[in-house]
Amino acid sequence: MGFAEWRLRNKYWTIYIVPLVVLLLMIYGTWAYCHKLCYERVYRDFGHKATAIGLICTCCVLDALIIAIWVLIVSCGPGHQPGVAPHLLVDSADLENTTVAPNCYQSDPHGYPVWCSNCQSLKVGRTKHSSHQGHCVPRFDHYCVWLGAVIGFKNYRLFVQFVFYFAVLLMIVWITISVYIRDIRQYHARLNANLIVLLIISGIGWLMTSGLFVSYIYYMSQNLTSIEVIDLKKRKRTPELSMQRLYCYYNSDDHYRYVVKLDNDFKGSVYKKHWLKNIKEFMGSNPMLWFIPLPQYWHESPLANGERDVNTIVSPYQEEVGPHTIDYIKKRIESGEYIHKFKEPGREKTHL
């Protein structure tokens, strides 16, 4: 049995092992930092009592904040896209059991949208089916093995906050140990092994979390998810994968739908807008809340409840295609570079 097969069969065990290791390392690091460094060295040996108490309080507050955000990430979840019925794209389709297609959506060469066979629903926007959650996740970003949680539309901001505050904590720990190393060596011939281990762990962790945080700032500014970044890198190595990027667009000028392929000359995210608006789509419209770990709660229903407008059904998970994408598609249509063209009966029927 290969490792990949073993991991798949034992996923319900492995999803707890790594987060448990991370939690134990946090507990060990807090003990080593607060007791071995702050109390035994800074407080007792050097007599810097106010500094030691301040460092201990800062570490404990950040620890509590990080664990609280972790709990919120898992408890809130990534979100659950409501069920969306097929679009009304053919005359023979049942009007009551279909939905009106948005102006632009990802499709196959014939103009049919992406379908999830597990949820029996359309995948709207950047929705992906998550095997860990058992349902479709809106704006699926990735599965974080360190936290044992799927990151998506609903808990994305919490994840960014988790990475940020973890990076701050590790930075404080690493800098504090580095500053006091010389003074400690004057009192003791050997540096405590726990402090050496903590210095290494905090240094590596700081580089990882700070690098991850900077990367996510860039991803958000470009309106990209982690899975899209991986896909873009694959396309650079294998250009033929660009055949998968097909979008169906309703042209209001002639009232036809066109299926257009986004070639490799199309750069960036389909949803890209102004960089600040991109960040607000991920972090929220209020910058004051970007650093406050508050969960986002709203009513979710796995059923469409008879609603036919897709944007209303998936609200508040609705995502708009960027203006530069629309301009690119229109230019392809004007030059005749499209794959398929058809009349959409759904719009005619809904306007009768």
UniProtKB/Swiss-Prot annotation:
The chain crosses the membrane at residues 12-32, 53-73, 159-179, 195-215. It is found in: Membrane. It is an enzyme of class 2 (transferase). One of its GO terms (molecular function) is protein-cysteine S-palmitoyltransferase activity. GO terms for cellular component: endoplasmic reticulum; Golgi apparatus; membrane. Residues 114-164 form the DHHC domain. It catalyses: L-cysteinyl-[protein] + hexadecanoyl-CoA = S-hexadecanoyl-L-cysteinyl-[protein] + CoA. The keyword Transferase applies. It holds the Pfam family DHHC. It is a multi-pass membrane protein. The active site is at C144 (s-palmitoyl cysteine intermediate). Keywords: Acyltransferase, Lipoprotein, Membrane, Palmitate, Transferase, Transmembrane, Transmembrane helix. Its EC number is 2.3.1.225. GO terms for biological process: protein targeting to membrane. Belongs to the DHHC palmitoyltransferase family. PFA5 subfamily. PANTHER family: PALMITOYLTRANSFERASE ZDHHC6, ZINC FINGER DHHC DOMAIN CONTAINING PROTEIN. The DHHC domain is required for palmitoyltransferase activity. This is Palmitoyltransferase PFA5.
